[in-house]
């Protein structure tokens, strides 16, 4: 069974929010994806410019851009300290302030709007399908404030919360289990597949100790987040991959 301390920590993540938030309207744009599977170095170089460190008075975390107008996804527990304004910084010298505009406590995610960034590089999203066990993934973020950190692993499982967590994590939350390391400060960063598409938002890890399993890390599915936002999927198109993005025959990789 899962320990009492872990359940206590999860209750802090998936807590009820008494504030009413106006749900923003978000339309998904298809990305153009190379037909070639990319190695970790390629994915990191293309993804890191879209990953940011978030700093508030109560702590820090990670996030990433989902559109070209400075809209950032992160975890709710990153912004749960009461801060409304956050400092946004990127691995490439990017610096700005941003404001929390939406919080979903049931799925532990939040949206932050950057004040001045209007040409952000959005990451492609795997919006139409959950990943499969065994797929390669990398986690990006700022563990302990160390911006631009990349860890690699596989999807260990895609699961609904176990019976141990049924009173803590909502039943409709899909957890992506991975052995890619997720550490404090990594929360809110993207978990991406070998095409560089976001499959989840890094959320928490199960602390390991003597007699317990190691490398149990979890992300919230981007599919569930987009569904919660009532995001509008683009219409049907030819040459799309399982994530819904357009596959290019050439060995290129570009964002919309």
Please provide the spans of the model-predicted regions:
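Active-site substrate-binding loop(s) of clan PA
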Residues: 42-43, 99-101, 114-147, 183
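A conserved glycine-rich beta-strand in the N-terminal activation segment of trypsin-fold
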Residues: 36-41, 50-69, 94-97, 122-124, ...
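N-terminal activation segment of mature serine protease catalytic domains
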Residues: 2-65, 76, 83-84, 109, ...
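Active-site region of chymotrypsin-like
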Residues: 48-50, 114-124, 150-230
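Short conserved beta-strand and strand-loop elements enriched in small hydrophobics
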Residues: 54, 84-91, 137-141
